[in-house]
Amino acid sequence: MIASALDRALDWTVFPGYTSLGYRLRAAAWDGGIPPGALAGRTVLVTGVSSGIGEAAVERLARLGARVHMVARDPERGATALERVGSKLEDSGIEAGSRLELERCDLSDLNSVRGFAADFAPRAPQLHGVLHNAGVLPPGRRRTPQGHELAFATNVLGPFLLTNLLLSSLRAGAPSRVVLASSGGMYTARLRPDDLELERREYDGARAYAHTKRIEVILAELWAERERASGVSFASFHPGWVDTPGLESSLPRFHRLLRPLLRDADQGADTAVWLLATAASEQRPGAFWHDRRPRPAHRVPWTRESDAERHRLWNELARITGWSEEEKGGR
């Protein structure tokens, strides 16, 4: 009861709850860890693996027995991350070659996503987990090869298309789990289905990022509804404030001021790994999680979207990506 009260207090005060202190206080009350070998024989795909949370998640998933496909935009940086993780596994007596495989895909480029899915799906006829960790917070408005705003393309369009194209493999691997890395910043954002790329206002990278993170939370809920009978579960999560190269480059002042209090990458990856390795997301379909507990998707009423707006979002994403229900992996 005391632990529950402390958790609620940390959740609502935000500042301590998102720091390393909040993680340590909550972790002290958890009942045990993830059983060794929880993912033995299972295949998991992780995006955004070149550093930080993604790299930490890859290592932990591999240690739990998973065969982890590491998806990187930059093959050189991805190979360096694979070497770092592989070296740690080998030092622990785990054969890295049987646990890790590097893949190349640029989530911001829809052609790259389609090409990767077409190549990967036959190699993974049964897929048991996906962690969408790749993300970007641009300093200014930047365009992708298809002309879309970079944060929207990387954080939303790529994951939307890739997940739908891999649904056949996920269904074949059921019970399987898909986890999307969102952010506490999404609490400030309301879905704008009539302006998904925020073209009607002066560009602000943090605002664009928060909007994409709100969309990710909604997508987890929508997929959970659509796939409730298929054995594929969906969840989104907030990793907390984590000391990563991405945070340092995108929010340098925030990083500099709070660095002593930031979580390390392993703490940031914890909830994602826990969701992929346990049945928690199956018990709370589509929920938004932080530190192994479901959290409210909204803090204030004016960020809530209507059912019509959610439906419009799905249809717009399908139109923009060119994905249809009839495609392989569709319903």
Put a short name on every predicted segment.
Residues 1-45, 190, 306-331:
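Non-catalytic terminal and boundary segments that flank Rossmann-like NAD(P)-dependent oxidoreductase
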